[in-house]
């Protein structure tokens, strides 16, 4: 029996993002082979998005870029983008990620759980630093954004950037898995 191959393209070469998309799809389609690749895709927003709106737009821009580039090559079945950002909410600053998934002519959007941030970290971000660099300095790590991320550091490894992305991707896939009942939007 031949297994179905699902080709996915991730709008990043970051192994955390590629692994998260691969793991999510393997959970959703356990009888399929997941063929994943990443590509550099511009977000069109600041390197460290500071609002919910910019973070969402960055993920959408990355997915659209991947889809446009792929029209000249072989097309993927699904396109994924994960854009991490921060915002200051009523309860304080927090980081989160938006997930954008392109499939045929459909676009699905999801958002990860949020992680409250210490005010000193948020102030450094307001001054123009990226979260990964701030966390590397604070915890004396190197390139944490391609490992457990701020999530891994602040939860003592009980959650990671990858696990957060994986869960968010699975949830964002719901409209694509059930297109008939998601036909209408608000």
UniProtKB/Swiss-Prot annotation:
UniProt keyword terms in alphabetical order: Hydrolase, Magnesium, Manganese, Metal-binding, Nucleotide metabolism, Nucleotide-binding
GO MF annotation: an example: ITPase activity
EC number: 3.6.1.73
Free-text remark on how the cofactor is bound: Binds 1 divalent metal cation per subunit; can use either Mg(2+) or Mn(2+).
Reactions accelerated catalytically: XTP + H2O = XDP + phosphate + H(+); ITP + H2O = IDP + phosphate + H(+)
Family annotation (Gene3D superfamilies): 3.90.950.10
Cofactor or coenzyme needed: Mg(2+); Mn(2+)
Binding sites annotated in the UniProt record for Mg(2+): 75
UniProt KW Magnesium keyword: yes
Highest taxon above the source species: Bacteria
Pfam family, one: NTPase_I-T
Biological process terms in GO annotation: nucleotide metabolic process; thiamine metabolic process
PANTHER family: NON-CANONICAL PURINE NTP PHOSPHATASE_PRRC1 DOMAIN-CONTAINING PROTEIN (PTHR34699:SF2), PTHR34699
Family indicated by similarity: Belongs to the YjjX NTPase family.
Subunit field text: Homodimer.
Role of this protein: Phosphatase that hydrolyzes non-canonical purine nucleotides such as XTP and ITP to their respective diphosphate derivatives. Probably excludes non-canonical purines from DNA/RNA precursor pool, thus preventing their incorporation into DNA/RNA and avoiding chromosomal lesions.
Name of the molecule in the record: Inosine/xanthosine triphosphatase
UniProt source species: Shewanella baltica (strain OS185)
């Amino acid at each position: 029996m031949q297994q179905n191959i699902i080709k996915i393209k991730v709008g990043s070469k970051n192994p955390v993002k590629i692994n998260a998309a691969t793991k999510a799809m393997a959970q959703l389609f356990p009888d399929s082979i997941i063929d994943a690749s990443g590509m550099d895709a511009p977000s069109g927003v600041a390197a460290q998005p500071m609002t919910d709106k910019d973070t969402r737009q960055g993920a959408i821009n990355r997915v659209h870029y991947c889809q446009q580039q792929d029209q000249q090559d072989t097309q993927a079945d699904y396109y994924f983008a994960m854009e991490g950002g921060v915002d200051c909410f009523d309860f304080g600053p927090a980081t989160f990620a938006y997930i954008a998934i392109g499939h045929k002519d459909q676009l699905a959007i999801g958002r990860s759980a949020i992680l409250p941030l210490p005010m000193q970290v948020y102030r450094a971000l307001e001054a123009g630093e990226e979260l990964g660099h701030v966390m590397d300095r604070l915890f004396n790590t190197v390139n944490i954004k391609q490992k457990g991320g701020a999530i891994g550091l602040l939860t003592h490894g009980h959650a990671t950037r990858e696990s957060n992305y994986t869960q968010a991707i699975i949830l964002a896939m719901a409209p694509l898995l059930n297109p008939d009942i998601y036909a209408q939007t608000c």
